[in-house]
């Protein structure tokens, strides 16, 4: 009883999700299919030939009954029987070619869509990723694309072949007996009219199911990584997490049951309609045969043709529902493709000059605020899709110059804008006002890939892919030899550690490098930076999480890494920047002090307070979390 009530609840559940599919979505799908026009034409030719062949066997059946069996002609019966077999073999061969053609077009279109989606997403600004649920995004790139793929690959052939089959079958029926054919057509509106409404309903269910699946994927993505799993264990909440996941999975189950029951009820209704139509044809046609108006062979042929008519009509109606479900997938994919990218290459972007980059950096009256949600994200991929206003100004009137080979240190309290300032150099964000130049070139006029090739960054928590040590190092220079790796690791004071690993450079470091210590990860990141050989280096709290021993080793490695390069160093431990060519003190997004260590220490300002706190062994300024927002 409880199960029955549950099913009734599932059946009656109403989605509040919009259920219409826009013309723009359909137009864009056809746009992706445009490169395959020649293959589509060939596919249509094969489908047409196969559909025309489909009416041959019923006509042969008429001849077998009227011209062979009724006449007692065994030779004619044998020939006609062989022709039926030949027609079936030809149809089978054409069906194989038809399937190959539809799969080629469908899979090719999805390949193009998947690559375009991946390329677009990875070029989106960091602000997109800070707002987006990773699980929902992965679901969009994976599940939704697969949903579109299945529908297109299977439905493309179904729609075209069944449409042509229905048309040729109906024409043949009229040629055989127009009165019976008119009766067969009476039920056609009952196949066609409900399809639009049913399609909308199923599309709404499909869209809701995809959203629920994305929510479930987000939960798994956040919990099934080292940091998430560790947090759950340390707080002793596996039971609560399982309960929460069960609730999400239960909603996915309910929507799946609803979809299955609704779809099955529709198929049953179509089957009953087809059976009713076939019965009408046999009843009326049988009466005509009894009266001598048509032959028994014609009646048998029409019975087969009617079955061939209602079958494709039912499949076409179902295909319409499948197509609308597929367009839901496309709609969700296009939503990501339309995600705004405020940090794109300018249409008139120029390549970097051929001569070597000197590393002269200048900030000209730079101001910055973080973009609002509608400027840099997709609402349906956020946990809270409530629109917000543009962020407050976090950097205001910054004027700085860093000469080639010089070190600029940026210090200040947490939230003062240190990491934000550094993130503007590789254009993880663009300035709101003012400009930044590298060797006299406005960063916004340069191609991003060329700009970033000249900038190296080491953060307090460097990212390592779940891959080998060698693969992580070669991410900076894919063509690097083992000798190049040795040289970089030696300079980064990590070569001895690598050689002690079980498989050397082939040792897998684990997700985010969790199999390495913090100091080892930092030194691998420095080795990777040395392989990149940038003109400008940014160190964002690179030693803030290390103990004294590891910090000393990393500082030696950093000294080699910074030699001859322009450097911006964001420091929590002021002892690491006492030798900087210039120290800039930020507070609430503004430069409040600047100078060398001795000058600032003796000036009695904010820097002196931070230095005094360091001397006393107190915590002065909290460290940021890498390049990105500094917090409120």
Describe the residue ranges of each PLM region.
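Juxtamembrane helix-loop junctions of ABC transporter transmembrane domains
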Residues: 2, 12-22, 45-46, 53-62, ...
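Short intracellular "coupling" helices and adjacent cytoplasmic loop segments at the cytosolic face
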Residues: 9-19, 107, 115-139, 143-145, ...
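Transmembrane helix-loop-helix hairpins at lipid-water interfaces of multipass membrane proteins
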Residues: 12-15, 34, 40-94, 101, ...
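An intracellular "coupling" helix at the cytosolic face of ABC transporter transmembrane type-1 domains
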Residues: 30, 34, 38, 126-127, ...
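Transmembrane helices of ABC transporter permease
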Residues: 35, 39-52, 154-209, 281-294
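Helix-loop-helix
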Residues: 69-76, 172-186, 258-331, 336-337
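Cytoplasmic coupling helices
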Residues: 100-119, 133, 157-161, 184-226, ...
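ABC-type nucleotide-binding domain
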Residues: 354-632
């Amino acid at each position: 009883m409880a199960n029955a009530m549950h099913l009734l609840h599932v059946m009656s559940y109403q989605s509040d999700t919009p259920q219409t599919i826009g013309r723009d979505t359909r137009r864009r799908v056809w746009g992706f299919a445009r490169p395959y026009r020649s293959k589509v034409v060939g596919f249509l030719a094969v489908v047409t030939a196969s559909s025309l062949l489909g009416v041959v066997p019923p006509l042969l059946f008429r001849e077998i009954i009227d011209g062979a069996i009724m006449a007692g002609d065994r030779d004619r019966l044998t020939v006609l029987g062989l022709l039926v077999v030949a027609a079936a073999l030809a149809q089978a061969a054409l069906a194989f070619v038809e399937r190959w053609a539809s799969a080629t077009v469908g899979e090719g279109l999805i390949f193009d869509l998947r690559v375009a989606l991946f390329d677009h997403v990875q070029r989106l600004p960091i602000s997109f990723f800070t707002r987006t649920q990773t699980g929902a995004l992965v679901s969009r790139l994976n599940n939704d694309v697969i949903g579109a793929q299945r529908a297109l690959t299977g439905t493309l052939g179904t729609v075209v072949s069944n449409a042509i089959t229905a048309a040729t079958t109906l024409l043949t029926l009229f040629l055989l007996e127009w009165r019976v054919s008119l009766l067969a057509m009476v039920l056609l509106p009952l196949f066609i009219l409900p399809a639009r409404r049913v399609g909308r309903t199923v599309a709404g269910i499909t869209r809701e199911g995809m959203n629920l699946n994305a929510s479930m994927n987000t939960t798994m993505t956040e919990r099934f990584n080292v940091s998430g799993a560790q947090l759950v264990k340390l707080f002793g909440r596996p039971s609560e997490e399982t309960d929460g996941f069960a609730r999400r999975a239960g909603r996915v189950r309910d929507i799946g049951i609803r979809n299955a029951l609704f779809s099955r009820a529709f198929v049953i209704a179509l089957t009953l309609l087809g059976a009713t139509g076939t019965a009408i044809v046999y009843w009326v046609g049988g009466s005509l045969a009894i009266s001598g108006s048509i032959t028994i062979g014609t009646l048998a042929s029409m019975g087969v043709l009617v079955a061939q008519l209602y079958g494709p009509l039912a499949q076409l109606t179902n295909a319409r529902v499948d197509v609308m479900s597929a367009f839901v997938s496309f709609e969700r994919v296009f939503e990501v493709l339309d995600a705004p990218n405020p940090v794109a290459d300018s249409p008139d972007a120029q390549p970097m000059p051929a001569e070597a980059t000197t590393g002269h950096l200048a900030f000209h009256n730079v101001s910055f605020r973080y973009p609002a949600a509608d400027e840099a994200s997709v609402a349906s991929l956020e946990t809270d899709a409530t629109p917000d206003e543009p962020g407050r100004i976090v950097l205001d009137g910054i004027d700085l110059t860093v000469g080639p080979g010089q070190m600029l240190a940026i210090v200040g309290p947490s939230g003062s804008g240190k990491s934000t300032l550094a993130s503007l150099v590789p254009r993880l964000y663009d300035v709101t006002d003012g400009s930044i130049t590298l060797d006299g070139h406005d960063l916004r006029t340069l191609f991003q890939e060329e700009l970033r090739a000249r900038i190296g960054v080491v953060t307090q928590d460097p990212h390592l892919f779940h891959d080998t040590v060698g693969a992580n190092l070669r991410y900076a220079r894919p063509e690097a030899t083992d000798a190049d790796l040795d040289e970089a690791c030696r300079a980064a004071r990590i070569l001895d550690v690598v050689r002690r690993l079980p498989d050397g450079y082939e040792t897998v470091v684990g997700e985010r490098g969790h199999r390495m210590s913090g100091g080892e990860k930092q030194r691998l990141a420095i080795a990777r930076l040395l392989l990149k050989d940038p003109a400008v280096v940014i160190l964002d709290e690179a030693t803030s999480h290390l103990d004294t021993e590891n910090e000393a080793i990393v500082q030696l490695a950093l000294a080699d890494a910074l030699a001859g390069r322009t450097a911006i160093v964001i420091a929590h431990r002021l002892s690491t920047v006492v030798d900087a060519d210039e120290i800039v003190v930020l507070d609430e997004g503004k430069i409040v002090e600047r100078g060398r260590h001795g000058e600032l220490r003796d000036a009695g300002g904010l820097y002196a307070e931070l230095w005094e706190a360091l001397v006393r062994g107190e915590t002065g300024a909290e460290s940021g979390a890498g390049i990105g927002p500094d917090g409120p």
